A protein has these predicted regions:
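Short amphipathic alpha-helix used as the core "switch/output" element in two-component signaling
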Residues: 45, 67-80
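C-terminal output helix
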Residues: 94, 112-121
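Active-site beta3 strand of CheY-like receiver
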Residues: 50-56
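Alpha4 helix (beta4-alpha4-beta5 surface) of REC/receiver domains from two-component response regulators
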Residues: 23, 68, 91-106
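Receiver (REC) domain active-site loop signature in two-component systems and cognate sites
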Residues: 61
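Two-component/phosphorelay signaling modules centered on CheY-like receiver
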Residues: 16-35, 102
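Helix N-cap/capping motif at the beta->alpha junctions
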Residues: 36-45, 66
């Protein structure tokens, strides 16, 4: 059982309000280490500079979307093992299937509750302490 406070998280979303909501939700679950990026390109730079244990990324973003970020993270050996949860505003089966093909660990449809986020994170890491 990992301690939530030990999991370094990268939040990638082009909306600052959504990044704040994710951060606040994660803090409620005991997470303490965060970095943020406003698009996939910035998220990839963050991951290359200092890899995170968990990436929570929006799908629909400018410059490099969430699927492009996922593919780039999985292709780069130092970051390939990071857990990746994709956020999407639409429950699109084709999108989910494509993300699974590229190695997404879980996905979450917006809007979401803290309990739903917890379920998705625990689906990747197991029960949190």
């Amino acid at each position: 059982m990992p301690a939530a406070s030990a999991i370094h998280t990268l939040i990638v979303d082009d909306q600052a309000s959504m990044r704040a909501l994710i951060r606040t939700s994660m803090q409620a679950l005991g997470f303490r280490e965060f970095r943020e990026a406003g698009d996939g390109e910035a998220g990839l730079r963050e991951m290359i500079t200092r890899p995170a244990h968990l990436i929570i990324s929006d799908f629909n973003m400018p410059n490099l979307d969430g699927l492009g970020l996922l593919r780039a993270v999985r292709a780069h050996p130092p970051t390939a093992g990071a857990a990746f949860i994709m956020l999407t505003g639409r429950a699109d089966r084709e999108l989910v299937q494509r993300a699974v093909q590229f190695g997404v660990n879980n996905y979450l449809v917006k809007p979401f509750t803290v309990a739903q986020l917890k379920d998705k994170v625990e689906g990747v890491f197991g029960p949190l302490t």
